[in-house]
Amino acid sequence: MAQLAGQPVVILPEGTQRYVGRDAQRLNILAARIIAETVRTTLGPKGMDKMLVDSLGDIVITNDGATILDEMDIQHPAAKMMVEVAKTQDKEAGDGTTTAVVIAGELLRKAEELLDQNIHPSIIIKGYALAAEKAQEILDEIAKDVDVEDREILKKAAVTSITGKAAEEEREYLAEIAVEAVKQVAEKVGETYKVDLDNIKFEKKEGGSVKDTQLIKGVVIDKEVVHPGMPKRVEGAKIALINEALEVKETETDAEIRITSPEQLQAFLEQEEKMLREMVDKIKEVGANVVFVQKGIDDLAQHYLAKYGIMAVRRVKKSDMEKLAKATGAKIVTNVRDLTPEDLGEAELVEQRKVAGENMIFVEGCKNPKAVTILIRGGTEHVVDEVERALEDAVKVVKDIVEDGKIVAAGGAPEIELSIRLDEYAKEVGGKEQLAIEAFAEALKVIPRTLAENAGLDPIETLVKVIAAHKEKGPTIGVDVFEGEPADMLERGVIAPVRVPKQAIKSASEAAIMILRIDDVIAASKLEKDKEGGKGGSEDFGSDLD
C-alpha cells in the first residue's frame, strides 16, 4: 500500500510483503551471512563435516561447500545467490567453494558496517568493484609459472585439495590417481593443454577400502555379458560399437500380415532369423570379437553371437559409448551393415569381473586412451561418496594447473597478500571509496582467521603473527594449521591453481555487489495449500531467516 496526497492506494495484492531501503538490505545481508556461517566451520584441513538428512531420511556427510549448499533446501532469494556462488566456483575452478562463500559473507558483513555509518551503497559497490579488479591483477603478479609436465607439483596441488576431506588418510595415493587421470586425457592444442573432464569416468562400488580405488586406462561399465555362453574374457579385443538394436526392426506404419497357412508362418519366422543372422555374420566378418550395443539384442542374435565366441553387452549408456570410442579408437556405427574393419577399436583385454558381488565389464590396455575410469572403493556408501567428491576436486585442481600453468601458495597466503596490498591501494584511490576498499581488504582476512579458528588456534594471535611474517618474508607465507605457526606454504607443498582464488574473489565480490544493489524486496504471498494438506495463507518472507 502506498500513499498519495494523504490517500492510501492499494497497488499490490493482499498478503504481499514489502521491505524497503535499509530493511531490505539488512534482511538480504543477514540471509547471505547465515549461509556463509553455515559452511565456515568446514574450511581448511582441520574443518569439520556436516551431516545433512533430507525429508526421505537419506544422509549426506561432507565438508564440501558446494555439496552442503546443494543438499540444503534454501528458500530465501539472497541466500540462493550464495548457493550460486558455490556452484559457479565448483564449475569454474573445482575447488575453493567454501572460500568463495565465506569471503562473500564477510564482504557483506563489512558492507553492513559501512551502511551503518551512512555510506551510500553505490559508493560501497564502486569501492568493492575497484578492489576486486585490483585483486585479480595482484594474483596474476604473485602467481608462479610451473612446468605442467612436473608431476610433483601437480601431485602437491591434488594433495592440498584432498587434505581435510574424509579421504585424507590415503591422500598421496588418491593424488597420484588424479594426476595420472588428467595427464592421460589431456590433449595438446597449440602450445597449451586442454582437459575435458567428461573423459574421466567415476564408477563407485561399496566394499574393500579406499586403498582399493584404482585407475583403469580404459573404461569400466556397470553391465554384464548378455548370454551365459559368451566368453567372459577376451584378449586382443577387436571392439565394435553399435548404436542400433540387434533386433528385427518394426515398421513405421501399422501394417498387418494375414497368415493363412503354416508354411507362410514358417517362412515369416525363417526370414526374421535370416535378418538377425545376417547382422551377426556381418559383425563376425569384419573381425569383431567384442560388441557393445546401445540398445537391445534379440535372444536369437545373442545365441549366434555366443556360438561365434563374440562377447556382447547391451543397453550401454550413450556417455559410456562415447568414452569407449575415445579409449579404444572405435567409431560408433548406426547401421550394422555399414560396419567395416576400420570402425573397430582395440584393447588388450575386455573382461567381466565381479566387484562387490556385482558383474562389471573392464576394457583395459587401450593404446594411449583419451578416456579413463576411476573405480572408487570404500567401506560404506558415505565413504565412497566423499572419496568421489575429494577426487573430483583433485582432478579439477590438476586440470586447472595443466591448462593455466600457474599456481599460488595456499593456506591463506594469497588472501593475506591481497589484504596488505589492497590497504595500500585504498590510500591511492582516496575519497569515500577508500573506506570500501579497506573494508574489502579487511574482509579477506577472514580466510586465514577461519583456518586458525577451525584448527583450534587463537585466531587473533595467529593472524597477527602471520601478517608480521608475511610482510617480512613475502607473499608465500600462510597459516600452517598443523604446526600452529606461520610458514612458507610453497616450501611445504601447500599450493593451489591461481584460478581458485581468482574465481573465488570474482564470484564473492559479484554476489556481494548484487545483494547491495537491492533496496526493495516485494514478496508475493505463498499459494494456499489445499485444506487437508496443512496450513494455507501467506508465509512471512522474513521467517525464512529464522
UniProtKB/Swiss-Prot annotation:
PROSITE patterns: TCP1_1, TCP1_2, TCP1_3. It comes from Thermococcus sp. (strain JCM 11816 / KS-1). It comes from the Archaea. One of its GO terms (molecular function) is ATP binding. Belongs to the TCP-1 chaperonin family. Molecular chaperone; binds unfolded polypeptides in vitro, and has a weak ATPase activity. InterPro entries: Chaperone_TCP-1, Chaperonin_TCP-1_CS, Cpn60/GroEL/TCP-1, GroEL-like_apical_dom_sf, GROEL-like_equatorial_sf, TCP-1-like_intermed_sf, TCP-1_chaperonin, thermosome_alpha. Pfam families: Cpn60_TCP1 (PF00118). Gene3D superfamilies: GroEL (3.50.7.10), GroEL-like equatorial domain (1.10.560.10), TCP-1-like chaperonin intermediate domain (3.30.260.10). NCBIfam families: thermosome_alpha, thermosome_arch, thermosome_beta. Signal peptide: none annotated. The keyword Metal-binding does not apply. This is Thermosome subunit beta. Keywords: ATP-binding, Chaperone, Nucleotide-binding.
